[in-house]
Amino acid sequence: MARLNEQAMSSVALSTDNLELLRRKFLRQNRDIARVNSTQSLRIRGLENECARLLSENLELRGQVLRLEKELQDNAARRVADHALEVKAKMETQLAELSSLLASLGEPPSKRRLSEERRYAQPRPSVHRSPPLRRARQEADQELLAEQEGRLPPIYENKTYARATMNSEEILALCMQADDSNDSPDIGPPPVSRFVEDDMVIPCSPSPNKNAEAEETETTEQVEESPRALQVPPSLSPPKLDYDRRPNMILFSPPKESRVAEPSKMFSPPPMEPPKQSTSAVPSETIRAGLKRKLNGDNQNEPNKATKLQQGKENGNETGIKKGLSARDPHKRKSIKETATKPRAPLSAKSTNEHIVSPKKPAKPHQVADDFKPVKVHKASKGKEKVDLPAPDKKSAVEETQGNSTSAFTKVEILPPALEPTPEVAEIPETDILITPGTPERASESTVVTHDTPPPAHISSNGETSRPSRRARAAISYTEPNLRDKMRRPTKELFDAVSGEGKFLHRPTSQQQQQQRKGDESAPTSVSKVKVEPSPAVDISSLTSSALFEKEKEKEPQPDEGILSPNGILPSSVDLGRRRRASSFSTAAPAMTIPSVQEQSTLNLPAADETDENAAVEAQIQKELSNSITTRPRGGKGRQSMSRSVPTIPTENYEHEDAQLSTNSASVDLYDFASCASPDSAAPQLEATTGDVPVNKKAPKGSRRASSAASTETTATASAKPRSSRKRASMLVPKKSLWAEELAQEEEDEEDVGNDSGGSLSKGRASRRRSMML
């Protein structure tokens, strides 16, 4: 045992030694590994530093490469620029040589002095010019030469001296003349030439002047429609220089010294000379072909040329004015200044076509003398007013305008076509275009104008744009007859547009409506209190005593039955009494009750024997109804239907009740608002009969059947009638619950009335009848 223990102890000691050795070995290895790691980490750090250094060197090298490349490019560009500069310098030297060669080309011969050569060779600056007086003289000479040779004068630029044309006052005077002139402001005056002296005009060929005179008298009115008249007014156009295009006139311009005094001379009015009228035969002269303002060759008034001119000579001053305006030779031109209302302003426009007036719409109709009006115009006028002034007024107007000729700024005014002699108007061939029966005033106004080209047909002289009809017709009013006038009748009744007035409708007649209106006017309209006051009943015994009434009792009324029978007798469905307003039907108060079937049936009984028979029948009906009445609380489960029948009541009585119900329901016009009485008039309905019956009492079975039959008949008749009220049918038809309660109350009343004497029965019926009539 002891050896065994020793061996165990020895094995334990060996194991502990081995573990110690292993621990030391591991520690030594760990130290080696840590040393290797440290050396490796140091080496890694060194390599990283080397990489960073190499990268920085690489960047530096790249920057250097880029810098060198840029230097190369700059060197290349510099070389190109240097070459261009060299070429430029060479070209400048060559251009200098060429300019010297060109400068030597314009030199005068070498005989003259060098100073003169240099002075002429160098370009003269704009400052060193000739003095203004010498330049003005040269310009005046050049203008005079141009006028004599028929050329246009030269146009100078950059003038430093004052212009010799018009100042601001003259321009303002021209503007005022343009406003006061008879020319149209839209089209403008005819073309003019300025600075034309009457004394400087020398006629070269007298025969064209005569031809021009005859030609211009013909074309006095033709140029109004000419497109050449569309010129700018003189106030807007630039001032023109003094030249004239007429080849038959030789114009002279005064020298420069005389132009200074020219405005003062022009301000004074020219001397007036008496007009010289030509005595030669003007109609035989021909028209010159080369007229400046050429117009349409086809003159519509050519056959009347000779007669117009002859009549113009006979008229004295007026013809002299017109001839003075149309003359062209210098002797005839003197008459222009006489006939002008004002002397011409200095340097103002002098028209070459002085006889032409631009088209302008007249402010008022032309005044034509009564002596020279055409006969057809008088026939066409037919009583219309026309403003006619005699011929002496025109002469006085011309004299007034001549009296005003001493104003400062004047112009040659051309007389309007309204002041022309009127014998020409009478000889115009009257056509359908000028004179029509429907347009008398326009015909007389249009005959004054003697255009070669007439104005458009759709525009008259007064600016009207439509031609009226040939015949004067009366004005047609489309507002009458009105629909209200078509539908109006002798009375104020309204008829149904669908069914028509010829069909018999359930409406009260005009007499009934008058009675109802009288009752409505007398009755108050307040609904404050319900009073029991009997009102006088209408006696309908005379209407219900016939045989027709018996037939009406047996059958139900049809909805299309007429108001009057063929014999002229009112049927039983007509109620002549006053009816209650619809508001009394719609209220649910127990005091407002509708008369029962028995009360309504008593209204139609005419005689005493018939009332006794019906009283016996009603007593029997009331007894059987009272036996079958079963009351039930209002909140019960099973409510009996309104159409449930009672087997104890005989069918004859039901038929009689249905007939009476239908007749009375048909007599009530549900849609007649005017026929309904006020609640005060409908109030007396025997409140004593309603006091015994509780409000929430169940209606009897028999009364339910009767009320259902009555309601169906009422709705049937109401659907066939036209509406003439503002109330709806559902508001006017009596409610079924009200019918049931009222029937139950009336049945109890009938039992009480049956026990009374015959006199009390008749009194109660009479009072019920009165209440029903209300």
UniProtKB/Swiss-Prot annotation:
InterPro entries cross-referenced by the UniProt entry: Shugoshin_C, Shugoshin_N
Coiled-coil ranges per UniProt: 41-105
Xref: Pfam families: Shugoshin_C, Shugoshin_N
Major site of localization recorded for this protein: nucleus
GO cellular component: condensed chromosome, centromeric region; nucleus
Biased composition (Polar residues): 297-318, 399-409, 595-604, 640-651
Listed Basic and acidic residues bias regions: 109-120, 382-398, 482-495, 549-558
Highest taxon of source: Eukaryota
Segments for region (Disordered): 106-151, 205-661, 676-774
Keywords linked to the UniProt accession: Cell cycle, Cell division, Centromere, Chromosome, Chromosome partition, Coiled coil, Nucleus
Listed Acidic residues bias regions: 214-224, 743-754
Cellular compartment(s): Nucleus; Chromosome, Centromere
Repeat among keywords: no
Biased composition (Low complexity): 706-722
Basic residues compositional bias, start-end: 765-774
The keyword Coiled coil is annotated on this UniProt entry: yes
GO BP terms, alphabetized: cell division; chromatin organization; meiotic chromosome segregation
Family the entry assigns: Belongs to the shugoshin family.
Name of the molecule in the record: Shugoshin
Source organism of the structure: Neurospora crassa (strain ATCC 24698 / 74-OR23-1A / CBS 708.71 / DSM 1257 / FGSC 987)
Gene from which the chain derives: sgo-1
